[in-house]
Amino acid sequence: MTESFFPEFTARPFDADDYLPTFEVPTWLGPPWHQQPGVVHETRELGRSDSTVVLLDGFRCFDEGFLLRIIVRINDRGRQARHRTFAYLERAHGRGYLDERFAPNGLRWGIQYSTSQKATTQDESPYPPDGDLESAVVQGPVIGGNGRPEVHMDSWTRDFWVWPVPPEGLLRIAVEWNERGINETVTTLDAGPIRAAALRSRPLWPES
């Protein structure tokens, strides 16, 4: 028998190193593991032009922040034209935390709390250059991508993590995309349902 391409190995016991402790990340960085969010079914049109519609598609709310879903729908007929638009969104739909290849006329959006605190996709990343998340001091609010975007037919979809939970009052969401003909458009929502949904969030497994 000829020598095997692969070396011999001894199977490692699964109980030796397969235990995965709860992966805790700073609250500004993303949603917590093993927590069931409270959901707000809120759909709004955030911006529109002849070629493009930007939509808000609900909130999933945790005790420290919330995920919101942004959907971009385009009516470009050509496959290559759609590909160019979605490829741009894939690599750059903001600065810093959301990539540094942002085009000045590209999609940008942001949120503002009733306290006048504001975060936009043009903000620099709060991620510390030295990677020391434990000692990083971050001032909210913060917007960050969560997971990979999804593309299907005429739509691009992505979830975004927003930290912290907004205070009582109004939540403003602004969108602008000059290249696609969307002027700056501001949508105002009541933060109350988001706050109530955050209180409904629960751990999936109570601590033993």
What are these regions (language model features)?
Residues 81-83, 122-124, 183-187:
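A short secondary-structure junction signal
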Residues 103-163:
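Extended, solvent-exposed segments with strong compositional bias
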Residues 167-180:
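Internal, hydrophobic beta-strand segments that form the core of beta-sheet-rich folds
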Residues 173, 190-191:
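Main structured recognition or catalytic cores within long modular proteins involved
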Residues 77-78, 118, 177-186:
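Short acidic/polar inter-strand loop motif in beta-rich domains
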Residues 194-208:
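Acidic, serine/threonine- and proline-rich intrinsically disordered appendage/tail regions
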Residues 2-104:
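N-terminal onset of structured domains
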Residues 69-73, 110-112, 161, 174-176:
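Residue-level recognition of well-ordered beta-strand positions that form the cores
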